[in-house]
């Protein structure tokens, strides 16, 4: 059976998120930090680590999931490590019968009725606030599944409120990183962008708990 190489080298900030032992994780970052890659890899590793696991990656829309995350996921999982790839349903089944599937929060009814082991909510700040408490959270209950929220900030909205509540909960971890801390965008490039568009500011002060 083909073996998936799980020995990816993570950047230090990515590793701090990845290795957290908390059941729920919230990651707030600037754009181009690498959060989508990290969240998908978290699903891949967990799907590979046990049989018959069901893992969802939920983007604000199906179109976003297909355009961005699907390409990354197929790069992370070589064809030889897959039992089945379904381009229509944006799903990959591994040889251990675990499944990773991409969805859009714009069709919430398509999410219901499935028990999840692991789930990522990508750009949760830009989803309907009810997506988590009314749709996704109950899907984790019977399997005691784990969740990761990744998003750039969008004012003092529901994502901000969840982040602040999470800081007071023992089973949650919160992470807060600037774009430049991801290591993908150089300081020179960021300085150039801010000079051209003064509205562009550092995402946030680095914080971790």
Language-model segment annotations:
Residues 1-209:
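Phosphate/NTP-binding elements of NTP-utilizing enzymes
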């Amino acid at each position: 059976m083909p073996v998936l190489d799980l020995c990816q080298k993570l950047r230090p900030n990515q590793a701090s998120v990845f290795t957290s032992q908390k059941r729920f994780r919230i990651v707030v970052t600037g754009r181009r930090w690498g959060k989508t890659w990290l969240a998908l890899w978290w699903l891949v590793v967990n799907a590979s680590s046990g049989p018959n696991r069901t893992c969802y990656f939920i983007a604000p829309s199906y179109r976003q999931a297909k355009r961005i995350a699907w390409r990354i996921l197929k790069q992370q999982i070589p064809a030889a490590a897959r039992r089945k790839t379904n381009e229509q349903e944006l799903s990959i089944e591994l040889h251990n019968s675990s499944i990773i599937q991409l969805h859009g929060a714009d069709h919430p009814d398509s999410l219901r009725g499935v028990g999840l082991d692991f789930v990522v909510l990508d750009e949760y700040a830009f989803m309907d606030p009810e997506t988590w408490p009314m749709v996704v959270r109950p899907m984790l209950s019977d399997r005691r599944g784990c969740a990761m929220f990744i998003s750039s900030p969008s004012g003092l909205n529901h994502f901000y409120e969840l982040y602040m509540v999470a800081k007071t909960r023992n089973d949650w971890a919160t992470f807060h990183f600037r774009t430049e801390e991801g290591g993908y965008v150089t300081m020179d490039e960021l300085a150039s962008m801010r000079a051209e568009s003064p509205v562009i500011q550092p995402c946030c002060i680095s914080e971790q708990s």
